[in-house]
Amino acid sequence: MQAPAARRMSRWLRHLVWIVPLVIFDIWFFGHRRGGGCEPPVSVEEPAAILEQEVAPETHPPWARLVYPTDQQGILQPGVPGVYQPTASGNPDSAMYGSVRTGSRGGRLVPTFHEGLDIAALRRDAQGRPLDEVRAVADGVVAHVNRFGGNSNYGVYVVLRHDDPIGRVFTLYAHLLSLAPGIQPGVVVKPGAVLGRMGNTSSSPIPMARGHLHFEIGLILNGQFGTWFRAKKLKPDHGACHGWNLLGLNPLDFLRFQKEKPEASFLDFMATVPSAFDILLAVRRKPDFFDRYPALWSGEQPGGAIVVACSENGVPLRGRAATAAERGQLGKLKSRIIRVHEDVLGRNGSRLLTRRAGVWVLAVAGEQWREMLLYPSLP
């Protein structure tokens, strides 16, 4: 006959047989339902497929019927109060594109780069929430949708792909409160199609009173970015539509250009964008970027090095093979800054470049940019 203590232990062990599996299931099930501290699921395959579809050579620019992304009609007048939403600083310039903001780094204040326009709300409800609809600016295809506000600094955001003679141009609509029904990758949209409602979603807090639309337009740096990103074991994974891979040009400059030349292509606009720096890069092959935007490449195939003219935030504006003399200047280096146009570089908020011993070189952010541009054929 078992002692009382032994009987109690026996009953406890029998209970463990069904308690342990239930506990394990509970942890797994509710962890997946609630996110469990993991990143919410995002679509990473569909955007890549949509962005890599071929653009027909006879494609016409999609901008002739361009509309503004909200009901705000004063977008070309940044000096008018209420058109753009500044940061907490109250500085109107902080809503614009460029090195217009100041942040803290290592205990000191440094310029930071803002890659789009922050368009203010025209209408709000009784609680102060924006009521403005956010709309597609031109004919396009939904390339990516992030439905989880905490999964990106962009919050809830939509990326559209637009077919232009230059190739695939993107527009991005960020900090949305909600998405319109049916907005998902692969959906074709027309100018003015409602994408969602303006909001203040983000992985970093934005007060409701400063809810706005963050709008970008630009090019995709590398079609294989998602593979590079996952190899680094980084999160969150938005595939090719991660913000690092979407390099925006000045939307206000583009909108002004398009108003003057509504039939022009994005390539025509890019011809007006000045270079901030020209860089000599060691390569194994021509970068994916110039395969997807061949009109930005001139001349023969590279023979081990290329020269790229870049905007302040690293948009490759033009590329060509390096000359023999330029290859000689590179030596065993992986990169060399040929020239810097300091009037264009300005406050250098992207910090792709830095001075060392009076010489311009790639900074840490610049080395990452080089790696993303050249992947998967890094020298």
What are these regions (language model features)?
Residues 38-156, 238-379:
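Surface-exposed, glycine-biased beta-strand/turn segments
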Residues 118, 172, 197:
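Conserved beta-strand positions that form and line the central face of beta-propeller blades
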Residues 22-32:
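Hydrophobic alpha-helical membrane-insertion segments, chiefly the h-region
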Residues 6-21:
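N-terminal Sec-pathway targeting helices
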Residues 137, 183-184, 189:
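Surface-exposed strand-loop junctions at beta-sheet edges and helix termini
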Residues 124, 145-148, 178, 199-203:
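Short beta-turn/strand-loop junction motif enriched in small, turn-promoting residues
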Residues 152-161, 187-262:
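Conserved, short, structured surface segments that act as functional micro-motifs
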Residues 129-131, 135-180, 208, 212-214:
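Zn2+-dependent peptidoglycan hydrolase active-site motif and core
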